[in-house]
Each structure stands twice: as C-alpha cells, then as structure tokens.
Amino acid sequence: MVSAMRSGVEIAPDRVVVRFAGALDRRAVVHVRRILRAYLVRPGRVIVDVSEMGLEWPPGLDVFPAVLTAAGGWPVACLVLSGPTTRMREELDARGVPPMVPVVAEGESAERRLLMRPTRVYRQAHLPADLAAPRAAREFLRQTCAAWAHETCLPAAEVVVTELVTNVVEHAGTACRLGLALDRSGCEVSVRDFRPGPAPRPRPRPAEARRGRGLHLVASLADEWDTVRHTDGKTVWVRLAGCAGEGADREE
C-alpha cells in the first residue's frame, strides 16, 4: 500500500528544506527515509519541517537519527527538525532524538541551528572479519576525532578500539560495527560482533603474560564499561568520561 505521506522540497545551494505532511505510520517511514537519504548525501544539510506531520506510530521517529547515522553523521551530514507539535516534541524527547537531531520550534532559526554541532554526535563504521580491522578502526577513530575537532580522547580511545576490535577478530571471528559517540559526559566506544556467546570479561593473567591482557587494559582506562547481549551477538561499550565534548553546540 502506498504511503499517504506527502513531501515538498525547497533546494538552496547550502541546504535543503523538506516539508512532510500526513501521518507518520509504518508505511510513511519508508517514504521519509528515502527522501532524507537522497538529500543528506548532497548537499548534506537538511531542515525537516514537520509542522504538518501527524504521529500515528511513535517508533517511526527513530528514522531521523537512523538516517543521519547512515549518511555519515555530523559534520558529514547535518539534520534539524522544525515545528513539531507538542505531542511530537514530547515523543521525540522520550525517544532521545534531540541530542543527535536538534529540534527547533516553528519560527526559530533552523538555519542557524543547522550550523551548530549537536549535543551528541555519533558515527559508525562496519569492519570486516580480518586482521586489518584493528588498523582500520584506529584510522576511523582518528578521522572522526579530527572531524569533531576533539582529539582529547585519542590516546585512551585508540587503545580501547584496538583491543575491542582485536577481541572480535580473534574470538568471535565475525565482522563488527564500531560506534563512536561524544557528548558532554564523555566519549563512548562501542563494538558489536555477530556471534552469540558469553560476555567477555578480564581473566587473571600472569604479570609477564604478553597476550590476553586486552580487557584488563580496557577496564583500567574505562570510567564505565559493560556488555549488551543480542540474539545474534553482543556489544561491548566503554565510556571515557575524562574527554567530554566541551565544545558541543558550537558553530562550525
């Protein structure tokens, strides 16, 4: 069945304004995703006018941070929502959307907000199941920190990224998804594999041991860390609180 969601587009050299009208339901999410994917690639800066968008399926609001992440995340892609109804704004807040995708009231300057770094920035990379993955992970980390103009966390994060990705290659033997996030509370590294199994934990090792100490290093650097198990794998996440994103909400 065809979605009843309608869209209009206004194209400027430095941004695109997309206006959606109609109910956001399961079918409409497909339409919204397709339109936003196209314009987040070029020019990469999109204002979404949702003032005429109804809300029938609240989980559909997750399409906004999801499509931003798929497009490369800030600053490769920039996305702002404008003019939500009171109910939609409440649902956006409840689903944790605004830290990644700024939301402005109708009449506020969405153009100016488009130029500012969101409170929480996030990027991810998919890495193959081979010995080159840790090196590729470090390179992605360096590129991301440079793009965010935030390299405070690099020394510790490089160790964490290397150890977690190496652990996936050597023990899970699957491809993995590396996620990097930065907000006012710190930097977060997450690595997801695709092999079900027990959560990895540091095991006692002799002081002279040359291998098997990776998770001990991770635990010593982390302010918090844990494992989330999925039906098809697990995610290890690590928070480094000593390198918070002090420049959040700054203009580019």
PLM-predicted stretches and their roles:
Residues R113-E139:
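Surface-exposed beta-loop interaction hotspot
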Residues V101-R112:
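A glycine-rich helix N-cap at a beta->alpha junction
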Residues V2-R37, E52, A125-P134:
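STAS-typified acidic loop motif
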Residues V29-V101, E188:
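Amphipathic alpha-helical interaction surfaces in cytosolic regulatory modules
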Residues E90, A94-R95, M100-P102, P118-V121, ...:
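Conserved beta-strand-loop-beta-strand hairpin that lines the nucleotide-binding pocket
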